[in-house]
Structure formats: structure tokens, C-alpha cells
A protein has these predicted regions:
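A conserved regulatory-domain signal marking ACT and ACT-like small-molecule sensing domains
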Residues: 1-79
């Protein structure tokens, strides 16, 4: 996959509300999501979010997402 926009790869536990927690952090900073995907192998296991955005990605934002209890890994990709 080629990332043309600032992006996050977020590995997390598959639990209710995790997507909302991550997207709330983005919304609080005024970040617009231009592409989003989620994949998992089994219900309740681990999942991976791929989020492309229209700018606004920085280390402070990524650190807030990393601090969420269900997040296992958060990687920033800058074009």
C-alpha cells in the first residue's frame, strides 16, 4: 500500500470503543480522515487500523493514541 497522506498504523486489542477513542483524539485536533481500514483475524483478538489523514499528524498526536490502554503499537507514516 502506498501512503500519499500522513498515516497511522495502529495495532490494538479488538474491543468495543477503541475505534471511537482513536477517532475522538483525531477529531479533537481537527484532523480529517481521508481513508480508514480495519482488519482482524478473530473477534476479541488483535486488530490493525490503517488511518490516512489530511495533515495534522505529529508525535504528540501519536503519543496520545499510544497511551490508550487497548493500543499495542502506533506507527506514524509521513509521505
Amino acid at each position: 500500500m502506498l501512503f500519499r497522506s500522513p498515516s497511522l498504523i495502529v495495532q490494538h486489542r479488538d474491543r468495543p470503543g477503541v475505534i471511537a477513542q482513536v477517532t475522538d483524539i483525531l477529531a479533537d485536533r481537527g484532523v480529517n480522515i481521508c481513508n480508514f481500514s480495519l482488519s482482524r483475524r478473530q473477534k476479541g483478538g488483535e486488530a490493525v487500523m490503517t488511518i490516512e489523514m489530511d495533515g495534522g499528524l505529529d508525535e504528540i498526536l501519536a503519543a496520545r493514541i499510544r497511551a490508550l490502554p487497548a493500543v499495542l503499537l502506533c506507527v506514524m507514516l509521513l509521505p
